[in-house]
UniProtKB/Swiss-Prot annotation:
Signal sequence, start to end: none
TM regions (residue ranges): 3-23, 33-53, 62-82, 87-107
Name the UniProt record assigns to this protein: UPF0060 membrane protein MXAN_4406
Pfam family, one: UPF0060
Cellular localisation: Cell inner membrane
Record keywords: Cell inner membrane, Cell membrane, Membrane, Transmembrane, Transmembrane helix
Family: Belongs to the UPF0060 family.
SUPFAM superfamilies recorded: Multidrug resistance efflux transporter EmrE
Disulphide linkage map: none
One Gene Ontology cellular component annotation held by this UniProt entry: plasma membrane
Organism of this sequence: Myxococcus xanthus (strain DK1622)
Amino acid sequence: MNLLYAFGLFVLTAVAEVVGCYLPYLWLRQGKSPLLLVPAAGSLAVFAWLLTLHPTGAARTYAAYGGVYIAVALVWLWLVEGERPTTWDLVGALVAILGMAIIVLGPRR
């Protein structure tokens, strides 16, 4: 699988998960409509489906995906929630992305 394609798929997967978790947060913590649970469930279903599109084992896919998820969550924090990530947030995301790259690019038997 093309590395750029895989990374893009990880990003889409992370966005689907963040949306699926953020909408219930809005309902539970900010008093928004419980109807937000409907698109949240749909988003989480898309998230699970996107994970199946990766060609490697589920556990390895999910482990590598974690690094991208961290970076996407920080972008979400900045763009949607209006809170700029700290230097330490960015360093942590970089370490996570490096970990993801090691998992994805590492040699296989």
